[in-house]
Amino acid sequence: MKILYPGTFDPLTNGHLDLIERAEKIFGNLVVAVLENTSKTPTFNLERRIIQIKNSLSHLPNIEVISYSGLTVDCANDLKANLILRGLRAMSDFEYELQIAHTNKSLNNDIETIFLSTNTNYSFLSSSLVKEVAKFGGEINHMVPPPVEKDLKEYFK
């Protein structure tokens, strides 16, 4: 069984990291798929985001980090992954993620989506919120892993 955890991760937050660590305990392995989203201009380019994630996950040897573009369901098909992992912070996340899960299922009936609720310590976090705090010099060390914190401070100085 291969599990795919897709996202833009611009940047990776401690909420993402917590979800990855918990999923690794449950499933034993995981593929973190970093989306190259051509409709958005990311703060960090794809290569930098992958480096940040790999450096943040160095303590988890069973985690693979890849990049992809296009549909997540196509990425899952290419990897022969039959499970897509998504995190839920609030009810609004559930409504959005359920719609995506149903769309993926309509494109490939063998794909299942598994939802893990976010640890309450991180339920307020989003990548855009972290960038906003970093932009104005706020403390972010409790929001992101050290490799990401370093890059954000450098980016916004």
UniProtKB/Swiss-Prot annotation:
Its EC number is 2.7.7.3. Its main location: cytoplasm. Its cofactor is Mg(2+). GO terms for biological process: coenzyme A biosynthetic process. It is found in: Cytoplasm. CDD domains: PPAT (cd02163). The keyword Transmembrane does not apply. Gene3D superfamilies: HUPs. GO terms for molecular function: ATP binding; pantetheine-phosphate adenylyltransferase activity. Substrate binds at residues 8, 40, 72, 86. Pfam families: CTP_transf_like (PF01467). Transmembrane segments: none annotated. Belongs to the bacterial CoaD family. Homohexamer. HAMAP family: PPAT_bact. This is Phosphopantetheine adenylyltransferase. The gene is coaD.
